[in-house]
């Protein structure tokens, strides 16, 4: 269980690091150290997860335990993507709309079109805006809004990782009596000889 906790801690540091490092002018190489730490954490936590989950499951029920673990992992991944995607794109839209509202001379319809283009392209439209000198100031605002949205999404992910780390502290302590759980007689036949 220690390896899983260590992995989650590395993931937490890596994701929070993204929130700290990312900015409108951040070079790609500046994210490499925190992404490395995050990747190390994923490797440590994910590789051990099935074994940790199945450690307390009787051999006869290992298929159910493995299936439950796999389903929980898939539901968690899908929920995380949905939540963080919503945070990212709603923050991007809100921040960019607010910034564009401060520029006189841009009609509301055009502001909406810019925000929609940036959101629907997941930021790819920013490069097109930056290429035209007339829209370069808008591109700078869009970069800033995208950075703010990315930071908030990263800190939200770090929050959920912190919850996971705290929850993991309640696991792996053995039974309430402090004794190692015993394999019932019906499970001993399928568990194989004792070592």
Residue ranges and their predicted role:
Residues 1-103, 146-178:
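C-terminal module of multi-pass small-molecule transporters
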Residues 40, 51, 112-195:
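Transmembrane-helix exit segments and adjacent C-terminal regions of multi-pass membrane proteins
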Residues 99-118:
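A surface-exposed, glycine/aromatic-enriched loop/edge motif typical of exported proteins
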């Amino acid at each position: 269980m220690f390896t899983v906790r260590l992995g989650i801690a590395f993931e937490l540091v890596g994701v929070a690091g993204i929130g700290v490092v990312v900015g409108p002018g951040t070079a790609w190489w500046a994210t490499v150290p925190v992404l490395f730490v995050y990747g190390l954490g994923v490797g440590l936590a994910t590789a051990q997860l099935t074994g940790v989950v199945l450690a307390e499951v009787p051999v006869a029920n290992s298929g159910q335990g493995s299936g439950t673990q796999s389903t929980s992992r898939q539901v968690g991944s899908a929920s995380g993507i949905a939540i963080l995607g919503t945070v990212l794109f709603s923050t991007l839209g809100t921040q960019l709309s607010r910034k564009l509202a401060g520029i006189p001379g841009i009609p509301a319809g055009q502001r909406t079109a810019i925000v929609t283009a940036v959101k629907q392209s997941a930021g790819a439209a920013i490069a097109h805006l930056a290429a035209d000198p007339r829209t370069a100031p808008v591109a700078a605002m869009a970069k800033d809004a995208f950075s703010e949205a990315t930071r908030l999404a990263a800190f939200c992910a770090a929050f959920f990782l912190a919850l996971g780390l705290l929850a993991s502290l309640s696991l792996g302590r053995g039974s309430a009596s402090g004794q190692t759980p015993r394999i019932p007689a019906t499970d001993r036949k399928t568990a194989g000889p004792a070592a």
